[in-house]
Amino acid sequence: MKKAILMMTFGSPEEISFEGVAEFFTNIRRGVRPQDHEIQTLYDNYIRIGGTPLQRITREEVNLVKERLGEEYGIYFANKFSRPFIPDVIKQMETDGVEECICLILEPHYSFYSVMGYEKFLESQQIRFLVIKDWYQQQSLLDFWTDEIRKILRNEVGEESFKVIFSAHSVPIFALDYGDPYIDQIFDNSRLIAEQLGLMTDQYTNTWQSESDIGIPWIKPDVLEYLREQKQHPEHYIFVPISFISEHIEVLFDNDVECYDLCQELGVTYHRPPMPNTDSRLIDALVATVRANEDKEFKTFLPEEETFDELAPSATTKDIMKETDDLQMPEFVKKLIEKKGRENVKMPYLIKKMLEKAGKLPKE
């Protein structure tokens, strides 16, 4: 039986041009092209950081895993929102005769909002899949962050005051209302690293970053809002974006530009440890994750039954929740429906699937 590992990531623009960024942004927005001013802002951000190394770094990570596991598994790589797209790579795997596939998403934490969006594409009549939900507790990954933060504390902070800010990509509040484990995993991840460092509870905190402006509330505090709200600041802030493993725009711009600039304004020294990227400790964590899961059950994936539809609204969106006073419908959805009209609101289908997942709404 031919087995494979499919390593997946979010993706990035295939070329740093206005239209290249527009294509990527349109994919993220479910095929709806954003307004030109939105594209221009994102394009300007990419120009500010000199492009994005994400695809290069990810391919190097894939090759390093292949060096370790390539004799046992075919190693494949796909993106969620840029080429090579997940469905195209699955077709290639089918052509290659793959029958079982371990899906290793290059995001250490599990969230309905993010990881289930990958699961949507895992459709094959030939291949059975095993999706690894999370792997943030791998000791070598914890050791990476601990070691790199400790270097900053020892070599750059010394005896001066500091605070470690663990930041993670924000998710919409409704994801948490229906049992999403993401926020608990982020807090647990931060605690594990802080314990290894011997930090006191007042020496670190959690914030959120990189939320999208899509008209719905996201979990708080946003990292920039947190900084502005503090009445007193330490001499050093150490920003640790633990929900990511590779350098990309949400680290290189959201942290290294926006957080850095605000620290300059506040008179505080900005620090960020290097990202795991291709470090051997990350590769150890990825390999150990595969080993810890490879004997679990593989199954045929039926995306419409396994996940909510993150990328496209149902054809019957307007019929899903007919009454805007349905008590199970979040307030912001009611407001969206009142403002835009039911036919133009894509969110209720997402909410419905999450309610089903949480057992609060019977499946059809």
From Swiss-Prot:
Q: Which residues bind Fe(2+)?
A: H169, E250
* Pathway note: Porphyrin-containing compound metabolism; protoheme biosynthesis
Top EC category:
lyase
Question: Which reaction(s) does its UniProt entry say it catalyses?
Answer: Fe-coproporphyrin III + 2 H(+) = coproporphyrin III + Fe(2+)
* Superkingdom to which the source organism belongs: Bacteria
Alphabetic keyword roster: Cytoplasm, Heme biosynthesis, Iron, Lyase, Metal-binding, Porphyrin biosynthesis
The residues that hold Fe-coproporphyrin III are R29, Y118
Molecular function (GO) terms for this protein are:
ferrochelatase activity; metal ion binding
List the subcellular locations.
Cytoplasm
- Which Pfam families is this protein grouped with? Ferrochelatase
GO CC annotations? cytoplasm
EC annotation from Swiss-Prot or TrEMBL: 4.99.1.9
Q: Name one GO biological process term.
A: heme biosynthetic process
Keyword Iron: yes or no? yes
What is the documented function of this protein? Involved in coproporphyrin-dependent heme b biosynthesis. Catalyzes the insertion of ferrous iron into coproporphyrin III to form Fe-coproporphyrin III.
Family to which this protein belongs? Belongs to the ferrochelatase family.
Any idea what this protein is called? Answer: Coproporphyrin III ferrochelatase
